[in-house]
């Protein structure tokens, strides 16, 4: 693909993303993976890497996986020095080739694979305040935000400093336990490799540092963890002991799993007294459980 073809493919990809056409997105990315040999200059000129990079946190698993594969391949392309196509023009001086190769290598170091970028590898100074605790926390924020990211180090350190400032303000300007515990909680959630959406949302400013500093543990959690928590909550409801009415078996309810009508049930008041009671059902055939009110 030349630059014109790539721009055309990029426009089509953006349209497919906007229209949520998963099949088209995957088809276009397959072409990009097979036909594009990435160079630093090409990625800067077309800004294609930004579009594909954002898809790594796409809710569709296939789209996210393919986007990650493409980004990995393009990083390898740049690493191998493919921007230096071996033309026979003798006018190109060795020093120019060396300069371009050096720039490409620096770019690869900044865009290394998942888990390898840190503020140290990016040569970023995190000692930007007079407080050692704050500087350490800013470094932790940088290391968490940079996971799987191709964003510039200047953007990431700016975000890390903004997060520090917001958390510090909420802790009355003191780096005591409130500040440290909050920064530790944010670090643990941001560095979670199963939580790419949170990192991406912060870097895109979809979640501002101010908003991030006030988010609850449930809001910070990854989708997988939220599902696990919801499942656990449901299990706890069903296994709750105490003043629980006697179960009765009826054929009035149909199991959504096995379609049988041998269902035991009981009712409990789980909300306020003026709200309907919650009915807890369990299929006696397959063990499927559900509730409604």
Swiss-Prot record:
Residues 4-81 form the TFIIS N-terminal domain. It is found in: Nucleus. A zinc finger (TFIIS-type) spans 251-291. SUPFAM superfamilies: Conserved domain common to transcription factors TFIIS, elongin A, CRSP70, Elongation factor TFIIS domain 2, Zinc beta-ribbon. This is Transcription elongation factor S-II. It comes from Schizosaccharomyces pombe (strain 972 / ATCC 24843). The gene is tfs1. GO terms for cellular component: cytoplasm; nucleus. Its main location: nucleus.
């Amino acid at each position: 693909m030349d630059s014109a073809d790539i721009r055309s493919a990029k426009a089509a990809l953006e349209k497919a993303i906007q229209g949520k056409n998963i099949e088209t997105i995957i088809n276009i990315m397959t072409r990009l993976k097979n036909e594009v040999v990435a160079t630093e200059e090409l990625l800067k000129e077309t800004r294609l890497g930004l579009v594909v990079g954002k898809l790594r946190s796409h809710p569709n698993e296939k789209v996210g996986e393919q986007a990650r594969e493409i980004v990995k391949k393009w990083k390898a392309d740049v690493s191998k020095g493919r921007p230096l196509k071996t033309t026979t023009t003798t006018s190109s001086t060795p020093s120019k080739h060396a300069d371009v190769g050096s720039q490409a290598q620096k770019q690869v170091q900044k865009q290394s694979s998942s888990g390898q970028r840190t503020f140290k590898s990016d040569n970023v100074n995190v000692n930007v305040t007079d407080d050692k605790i704050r500087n350490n926390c800013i470094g932790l924020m940088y290391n968490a935000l940079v996971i799987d990211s191709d964003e510039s180090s200047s953007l990431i350190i700016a975000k890390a400093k903004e997060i520090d400032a917001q958390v510090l303000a909420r802790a009355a300007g003191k780096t005591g336990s409130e500040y440290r515990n909050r920064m530790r909680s944010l670090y643990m959630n941001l560095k979670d490799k199963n939580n790419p959406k949170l990192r991406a949302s912060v870097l895109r400013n979809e979640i501002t540092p101010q908003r991030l500093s006030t988010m609850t543990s449930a809001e910070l959690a990854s989708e997988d963890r939220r599902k696990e928590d919801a499942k656990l909550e449901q299990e706890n409801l069903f296994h709750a002991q105490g003043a629980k009415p006697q179960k009765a078996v009826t054929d009035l309810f149909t199991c959504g799993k096995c379609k049988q009508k041998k269902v035991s049930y009981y009712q409990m008041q789980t909300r306020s007294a003026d709200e309907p009671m919650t009915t807890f059902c369990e299929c006696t055939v397959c063990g499927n459980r559900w509730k409604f009110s």
